[in-house]
Structure formats: C-alpha cells, structure tokens
Amino acid sequence: MTNSNSITPVMQQYVTLKQQYKEYLLFYRLGDFYELFFDDAIKTSKILNIVLTKKGNVPMCGVPFHSSETYLNKLVKLGYKIAICEQLETSEEARKRGYKSLVKRDVVRIVTPGTIVEDSLLEAKESNYLACIVRIKDSCAIAWLELSTGLFCYHMTHISKLDSDLLRIGPKELLVADDLLEIEAVYSIIKKYRFSITQYSSSFFDENRAYNTLCNVYGVSTLKGLGDLKGVEISVCGSLLEYVIATQKGSLPKLGFPKAYVQSDFMFIDAAALRNLELFSTQSGELEGSLIASIDFTVTASGGRLLKRCLSAPLASADAINRRLSAVEFFVNNQNLYKSVRQVLRGIADIERILTRVKIARCSPKDLYSLKLTLEKTYELVELLCKFNIDIISEFCSRLGRYEDLICILNNSLLQNSVSSVKDGGFINPECDAQLSEYIYIQECSNQLIQELRDRYRNITNIQSLKILYNNILGYYVEVSSNHLIDDKNFIHRQSLANNVRYTTTELKELESKIISAKDASISLEIKIFGQLCSDVIKYADKITITAHAIAEIDMLTSFAELAVQYSYSKPIIDDSYEFNIKKGKHPVVERNGKFITNDINLSSEQRVHLITGPNMAGKSTFLRQNALIGILAHIGSFVPAEYAHIGVIDKVFSRVGASDNIVCGYSTFMVEMIETAAVINQATERSFVILDEIGRGTGTYDGLSIAWSVIEQIHNVNKSRAIFATHYHELSKLDKYLKHIKCFCMKVEEWDGKVVFLHEIIPGASDKSYGIHVAKLAGFPQSVVNRAEYLMDKLKTNEDLLT
C-alpha cells in the first residue's frame, strides 16, 4: 500500500479498515459499487475477469452493488473470504456533521464459505455446513452448524474415524487450531478433501472462553439446564459460535441448543464405502451416475437436503426404519394422493432458509411473500392428508400447523409483486397505512399536481406559454419567454437566459419538497412496516420450523413412493435379526442403463460370508455394490430394487472395492487397499455389512493370497459380520471346507465356438478360470499380443521354460 500521508480521506478510511481485515478481500462500498484496491484489486480482477484500472498509483476494480452476489458466489465457491464494508449513512447525513465530513463506513459482515445464508449463494438441495474440530488425545469433538437453517450438532469421534465423519458431514468450511494441522493423519484428510480452512491459535478454543460464549448466546448463567455438553464438547460448540458471531458482526439468528449426534442411532458408513459406493458422486466427481442422482425425486429444496442427510447417516433402529417404510407404503397404495401432494409441494418455498434470513434481518419482501404463499399451501396439504386416519399422517397434519393470523397480516401488508430488495420501496400495500397512502398519492399524482399548478399560474399571469419544468440544479421552476416577464411579487426571479426567464414561488417550493421527500419518506415507512412484519414472523419461528421439517419429510417420503412406483421397488422386511436375504436384486444405478440381470443372495447366520470367484468383467464388483446399496436404501426407509428383501438391522457398512493411488496423501494403491481393509477388520461387528473386492491383488501372488486368506478368517471367526468377498485367488474356494459359515459362489460364464459370454449371473460353486486373456481381447489388444499371451499361458500350465 501507498504512504497513508499522501492519500485522500476516502482512501485513508479504506486503508484503516483493510488493516483490520488483512486476511479478507475487502468489498468497500462507494455509491452503487463495491470497490477493491491495491493487491485485493489485482487478485480479484483476475479471478472475476473484470477490468483492473488505476487511480493515480492505486490499482482498483469494482462490481455493481445490485449484482454483487453473482461475484461473491464465484469468490466464495473458490474458498475466498470477503469482508463487506457498507456506507452507514447518506452523504446528506454526513454533511450535517460538517461540510467535509466523510461518510461513515464499516464492515457489517464477513462472507465465508460456511456462513452464507443468501439463496443466490447457496445450492438449494445442498446443506452448507460450517464445522469445527477440537482434539483431545486420540479423540476429536466435531461441531457443525448450518447457519441458513439453524441445524446445529456435535459428536465425539476417534481420529481414525475423522475421515468418515468429515465426508459424511461435508462441511464447506472447517475451523481448526493451528496445532491440529501438525498431525499428519488430520492434515492428510483435510488436504485430500480441500476444505476451506480457517485457522486460529489454540487459545481461541479455550473451554472457559467457549463456555462464556455459549452462556451469552443462550442467555443463561450456566449450561447445566440445557444439555449434556462437557469438556471438549463445550470448546468445539462455543468456539464455532464465537466465529459465527465474528463473521455476522453480532447478527446471529436464534439457534437451538446443539444436539448430540448419537452414532448408535445411525448406520456408520466408513469413508471408503461413501466413496466406493458412489453415494453422492461418481469416482470422477460427477453427480450423474451417483446413487443420490438416481433416487432423488424430491421437489422441494428442504426435502432434497433431508434426503442427503438421511443417505449419509441411515437409521439403525428397526422401529424408526419401519415407521418410514409404513409411510412410504401408505403413499404407494394411494398413488393419486401422493401425486396430488407432490403437486402442492412443487409450489412451496424454502421456508427453513427464509426464516433464518428473517431472524438476522437479511430477508427481502419477496422472501416474506414466498413464506406467506407456502403457509397457505400447507392448508392444501392438510386438506389432502387429513382424510386418512393413520397415525403418521395425522402427525404430519398437526405439524403442518395453522397460520390464519400471520397469513392475514402478510396478505394485508404485502403487494403481490414484492421485490427482492427493500431499498427502492414499492412492496407494502398503501392501504395498510394512511401515512404511506398519502406519500404514494403524492408520488403518483406529482405530474397531475404540477400541471394543475401550471394551469392556475397561466390563468393568474395570462401567459398561456408558461411552463413548469425541472432540472437537478434549480429543481422545479416556472419558465416564460423573455417577452412575457411576470410582474407579481409571488413569483421570485431565479434565472435569466437569452430567450427565457425562470421563477419560483413559495407554493411551488412546498410542492417540490413534498414530491421529493414523499419518495424518501415512503421508503423509510415501508422499511419500518417491513421490520414489524419480520417481528410478526419471528413470533411464529418455532412453529414455522416444525412445519418446515414436516414439509421436508413429506417430500422425501413421497419421493420414495414415486421411486418405488416408477421402478417397481418392493418394501423390505426390517427387523433385529441377522438376515440379509435378497431375491432378484438389482443395482439401483446400473439398472437404469438398460437390461439388467437380477441376482439372489442369502447371507443367513448359517452362511454369513459369501466367497465369489470369476473373471473380471463378469459383474462381481457390481454385485457387491448392489447389495450394499440395497441395504443402505432399506435403512433410509426406502423401498428397494428387489422382488423380496429381508434385512436385519445393519450398524456399519464397509467397502473395499476398487482403489486408485492416493497421490495427495502419498499412498500407493496397495497401501490404500491395506488401510481400508484394516478399517474393516478393526471396526466391523456381527451386525456390520462388509464387501471386499480383490484383497491382496496389489502385491506378490503369495503375499496377496496370504493376506486375503487371513482377512477372510478374521471376518468369519472374529468380526462375524455379514460379508461378500470377491477374489481372483481360486485357492480361497477351499476355505468352505473348514470355515463353517462360508459358501462359495461364482459368476456364470458360457464358452461357445471359441468365444466367452459373461452372463452376469451368480451361481453356487467356484470358478476355475479367470478369462483374463479374453478380457484383454475385448479391450482391444492387438491379435499378435493376444496370441502370444495364449502361447505363454499354455507353457505356464505345463511348467515349461518361457525363455525356450
């Protein structure tokens, strides 16, 4: 930056503020633009591809205030943090303090990836979490908050499970202590997922400091009556809130006390399974082709977010799962009803996020109007649902609530064409306030009032060419030609030109004052009325939150019904047994590509481990993933892609299917494989579901076979989990001779006329061929290479010397 003694007062004000917010891009409000200067300008102009200019030696660029959210969106998505500096008064107000007084400006909030609430900056069906981690020995406390909805949770976890927890939560921004990043295991996870990181010294996470923050936020002197927070949990929740308060400059919505995420209530899906099963994105990072893209039929933003939360943490209670399944079954059996419900839901706004914007005084008239329309829509939902005397449906009706008084207030006060900003007015119904009606009348009738005054002056002066005109210098004025001078003391001379003379009158000045001030006064009054409307909405906040959650749940359940009807899914039997019996199961994503071969599986207590052999390309990996996905779908309360499914509650899902070199962490393919397998054998229980594909393939034959053999023994004898193990080691098929609960299966293959046909069908028994050369041929190997491979294979079978 330049010498502060040689810059203008405005730039001095900027420099002073920038010193306080060095780590942020400073959006400095100047009139209708946000301006950036010095290094901020150079960096931002490149990122946003906007013009970089100079004023003297100062680099600068700017974005229009009215379209600033578009630019903020791009910066936030790239992980930048922006300090928003606004004008706190008008230039007229500043001049009242002195002719050369500078307009007061200050930073009113800090926009970071994890603290945004504006619809234009948020993905409708994506949660936008800010998370915080505090470590104690080998454990971590995690807290996560979605400011746009108020969802606030915390959880204790072991460092070994941090990868899975962070992948499940998916925070947009992560708040950590500097020394936490010095732990290699933590640093590698954070670097791998490229979270936006905000670092503080360890003192920021002090427990006493956090305790005081929590007490201040919730207005209590002790936390004893609010929950079971203790020790490091206090640190993580309080520190997260302190950061939010700092970014919002104290404008914090009323938040519920943080809720403990109890792992035993939910299925644990480890990080490898979340990735390998492609629940939320494919291996290449695309949404298309993922499980959620295939099953998401939700029509509201909140329903979409709920579905994603449920998929990342499926239920682990048979009663809770069956409650959802019963609701889905009800809708499947009443298709006209659920289709009508979904039609109503399509017209419903994201009132969960609207309510937060109301609470922090950052909502628009359009938000309130959308809220009103949605509350009206809830009556339509109740009317559709209340005809059915079923417990879960009756519960939905009670949660949807009634809002006659609030709807009446909003209806009487808001115009239908409510705008997105309060600054220009024009959104409050003039009929709701007599003073506002007068201001609007003056504005709307200003031309008529001026014309009436002009006609009267023409009659008084007998000058029919007399005009009343307006410019920015004189305001309104009377103009006549130089040939028609006015000899009347009520007409005060203002200006003489070559051909015209201009006058004013006391009456004209008063009318001008009314016209000009009426606009400002009406906007001020509209803003005041709008503030009262927001206060009225906040009185219903708790009730609206309950309604919003009910809407999301109804949307998700009717979405499951639509999925079941469209693709002929069946209702699974869920209980506390150890069954996993699927008949004619299908992969919920792959089946959409066309003809799909169904398969059965029965992982009963008598044969809880299935060993599958067969060639690559025969469908082993698809079969493994398919059954894990069927289990997960059942646990979120969805029907499943199978003719029949009986599944005992699963507590954890582990997947070791496919691997790629984890270059970011410096791990080889084989190391990744071993780490993921270690997670399985260290954490799986008899209620877990495990799929393992080609364990040991990344090392020598004997090493790999030995590792695979011992892993199967461990899962069979110690973990006792339900497991499917696919392998190319045909020697492992001997294990069913001495391991009591293993059964061998293989992929059915037919050979005909020298050709191999993969039937993608699972049959009992073991495969004695891998058909690797045939797969190479299908992949496009030159015939000469294929022939040579066949020749060498024949030699190997007879133990001949390959070099002779």
UniProtKB/Swiss-Prot annotation:
Listed NCBIfam families: mutS1, PRK05399.1
Encoding gene, per UniProt annotation: mutS
Binding positions for ATP per the UniProt entry: G614, P615, N616, M617, A618, G619, K620, S621
Described purpose of this protein according to its UniProt entry: This protein is involved in the repair of mismatches in DNA. It is possible that it carries out the mismatch recognition step. This protein has a weak ATPase activity.
Keyword Cytoplasm: no
Family: Belongs to the DNA mismatch repair MutS family.
Gene3D superfamilies in the record: 1.10.1420.10, DNA repair protein MutS, domain I (3.40.1170.10), MutS, connector domain (3.30.420.110), P-loop containing nucleotide triphosphate hydrolases (3.40.50.300)
InterPro entries for the chain: DNA_mismatch_repair_MutS, DNA_mismatch_repair_MutS-lik_N, DNA_mismatch_repair_MutS/MSH, DNA_mismatch_repair_MutS_C, DNA_mismatch_repair_MutS_clamp, DNA_mismatch_repair_MutS_core, DNA_mismatch_repair_MutS_N, DNA_mismatch_repair_MutS_sf
Span of the signal peptide: none
Keyword DNA damage included in the entry's annotation: yes
GO BP term, example: mismatch repair
UniProt keyword list: ATP-binding, DNA damage, DNA repair, DNA-binding, Nucleotide-binding
Record protein name field: DNA mismatch repair protein MutS
Family matches, as SUPFAM superfamilies: DNA repair protein MutS, domain I, DNA repair protein MutS, domain II, DNA repair protein MutS, domain III, P-loop containing nucleoside triphosphate hydrolases
GO MF annotation: an example: mismatched DNA binding
